[in-house]
Amino acid sequence: LKSACLMLQYLTNGITKKLSDKKLEIKKTFQSPTMAPFCEDGEKYQVVDSIIKKIKNTKEKGEKVGSQTIEKIITINGIRFELLNGSWGLVRASSNKPSLVIVIESYESHDEVELIFNYINKLLDQTGKVGKYDQTLTR
């Protein structure tokens, strides 16, 4: 209860807008499920390193993912790349099972989530070391 009150205080501190109006200002997002394609424990970190190099290469060449360029790359525990419009994709090795972790979020559309997924999946396929996904994209 205390945390809920503190959150309301934070959200309304010095603001004269109604909370319902503030909610309308939040951008809609489209997310993928957290997907986990199979990858052997002994290979998953090398696969992620390979994906990092390929995504950095895409950025350096100015190539597009869908209709967007890659604007930012974070390589802590895998790779998170952010597109010009703020949408992003994440690829990392699972810490507790033989798989990778793939997550995607778009501020534009579910179609863009699919474009980002197709980009990531193509890179993973090129390694020849990634198997079946535990789940796939749904609408």
Predicted feature residues:
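Phosphate-binding and adjacent anionic-ligand microenvironments
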Residues: 1-103, 109-139
